[in-house]
C-alpha cells in the first residue's frame, strides 16, 4: 500500500505551515487534503479565524487534515493542534488506506501538540481541545478533577533516571574505548582474514605437496616397474640362452652318444664279421667235412635199400637224398583226405625249417658243386634279414650261415672239363680215406643213417592240382624211406654203392659237375654194406608202416596205378631180401645224442655249445637259399587230391628236409628215384637222440674255443 506523498505540493504545504507557526503572521490555521484519486497531499485553504472558522471548511466526502494554532492564557507560547478529519461519506477502503497516513502527516508538520480525530463538526470542541492542551500545566477547572490531581501528586513517587552530567574525561575515555574496540574488531577481522588466507595457502601448499609426492611416488613406481621389467627381461634372456645352451648340449650329447652307438654297432658288426670270416675260413680249410660222412651213410643206406627192389624211373621230378626220419610213427587207420587237410603239423625241434619251403636245387647244381664251393676260400659276407635264418640258431650260427651262403652264391659253377688238380684239391683228397675210416668207426654203434641216391634229370611235369597253404604245409615222407620199404634186388645194391663211391671221388677232387656219376663208374671191389656191424646179423625187419611203391616211368605205368596209402596197407609185405637184411630197423635205434634235443630247453647254454648245435642247421640254410634263387618250386602229387610243394615233410629228425643238403641231380638218367610216400595224418614225433655226436672232433675243439 502506497503512503502519503508530500513531493507534489511540498512548497505550498510548507509555506502555509510557516504562516501558521510564525508569530508575526495573522493566519492561524491551514487545511490540507488529497489530490483527486491519489495520495498526494495539497493545500486546500488557510485563514485567521481559529478553530471556529476551520471547522466550517471540513467536507464529509473527503479525508482532510487541519493545522491550527491555539493560544492559552496561562501559557506563554501557542499550542498547535492537528485535526484528522474523516468524513462520514468516505468509503471504508479509503478510511483504512488513510489511517496510516496520520503519523507521517504529524511528523511532516513538526511541533504538533495534540491530534484530534473528528468526523463531524461536533467533534471539534474548542473547550475540550484547550483542556487537552493545558493538561498538567494549568489548573483544572473542575474541583473534583483538582482534588484528584492533588491526591495523585501526593502519592506519586520519584521517578529514577540514568542521566548524568557530561564529563569530558569520561567521555574521552568512552570514545577512546569505543575506538579501541572498533580497532580491535578490525584487527580481529584482519587476523581472521589472514588466518583464512594462511589456511587456504596451507591447504594449497599441502595439495601441491601431496600432488608432488604422488607424482614422485608414481615416478618411483614406474621406475621400479621398469627395473622389474628389465630384470624379468634379462632373466628371460638368460633363461633362453641357458635353454639354447642346454638344447645345444643335449644335441651334442645325442650326437656324441649316437656316434658312440654307431661306433659300437660298427665295431660289433666288424667283430661279428671278423669272427664269421674266421670261422668260415677255418671251416673251409679243414680237411674233413662232417656232413660228407652223413652223405656217405645216406648213400650206403639208399644203395642197400635199392638192392631190395627194382623200381622203374620215377615219373616225378623228385629230389633224391631225402632220408627216412626215424622219429616218424604213422597210424594204421584214418582217411588220407581228411587227415591231410584238417590235422596240424607236429612240433619239431626246428620249427622254422619245418614250415619253410625251399625249391629243389638238385636239378641245377649237383652235390659235388656245393661241397667243392664250400671248400673254397671264403668271401665277404653280405647282410641278410634275420627272417632268412632258423629261429633255433644262434647269432654266430646265423653269421656262419651267411658266410657259407656268400661262398656258395658268389662262386660260379666250374666248366664241364675237369681242370688239373690244385693244391687245395690235393689236400682235400685224403679226406675220403678219413671219412671212410670214420664210417667204419660209426657203424660199430647201433645206428643207421638214411642215404641219398643220384637222381637222373627229368623234365618237370606241371603240377596237376593247385595246392592250398594247408596242404603245402603238410610234411611228407622222404623217398629214401620208401626205398627202404620197397623190395629190391641184391644186384642193384652193388651197382648203387659203386656209383656212390665214384661220385664221392669226383666230388672231393675236381669239384665239377657230376654228370658222369651214374654212367662212368666202376664197380667197387668191396661194398660199403660190409662195413655195417654183423654183416646183416643185426638187421631188423622193415617197418610196419606201409610204403607206396615206386610208380614206373614212361609207358610202363601211369599215375593212376599208384596205390593209395589205405590200399597199400592191406597188401602183404614182400619177403625181405639179402640186401634188406643188412638194414637196421629204425625202431631199434638207440637214443639220439643230447646235443640234438629240443632247442627250446637249451636257451641258457653257452655260446660255444649253441654254435656246435646249430652248425648243421646253418649250413643247410645256405642250400635252401640257393635253391630258392636258382630253381622254381616244383610240386609233388599227394594222395590223388591236390598238389603239394616239394620241400614239406611231416616231421624233422636230425635230418629234416629243411636241414638236409640239396643234392644235385645229374643231367643223365640215374638208376632209380623212389616215389614219395604220404601219411593219412601227421605222424607222431619220437624225440630221440644218438649216443655219438656226428660233429667231428676238430670242429668241436674250434667252436668250443670260441
Curated annotation (Swiss-Prot):
Residues 3-134 form the ADF-H domain. The modification N-acetylalanine is found at residue 2. The modification Phosphoserine is found at residues 141-142, 241, 344, 385, 387, 393, 468, 658. It is found in: Cytoplasm; Cell projection, Dendrite; Cytoplasm, Cell cortex; Cell junction. Residues 357-366, 382-396, 639-651 have a biased composition (Polar residues). Signal peptide: none annotated. Residues 209-236, 288-298 have a biased composition (Basic and acidic residues). One of its GO terms (cellular component) is cell-cell junction. Its main location: cytoplasm. Residues 331-345, 453-497 have a biased composition (Low complexity). Residues 209-497, 633-677 are annotated as: Disordered. Keywords: Acetylation, Actin-binding, Cell junction, Cell projection, Cytoplasm, Developmental protein, Differentiation, Neurogenesis, Phosphoprotein. Residues 411-422 have a biased composition (Pro residues). Disruption phenotype: Mice are born at the expected Mendelian frequency. Mutant mice exhibit significant reduction of dendritic spine numbers, altered dendritic spine morphology with a reduction in the number of mushroom, thin and stubby types of dendritic spines, decreased protein levels of the neurotransmitter receptors DRD1, DRD2, HTR1A and 5HT7R and reduced numbers of DRD1 receptors on dendritic spines. Inhibited memory-related high-frequency-induced synaptic strengthening. One of its GO terms (molecular function) is profilin binding. PROSITE patterns: ADF_H (PS51263). Interacts with RUFY3. Interacts with CXCR4; this interaction is enhanced by antigenic stimulation. Interacts (via ADF-H domain) with ZMYND8 (via N-terminus); the interaction leads to sequestering of ZMYND8 in the cytoplasm. PANTHER family: CORTACTIN AND DREBRIN, DREBRIN. Actin cytoskeleton-organizing protein that plays a role in the formation of cell projections. Required for actin polymerization at immunological synapses (IS) and for the recruitment of the chemokine receptor CXCR4 to IS. Plays a role in dendritic spine morphogenesis and organization, including the localization of the dopamine receptor DRD1 to the dendritic spines. Involved in memory-related synaptic plasticity in the hippocampus. This is Drebrin. The gene is Dbn1.
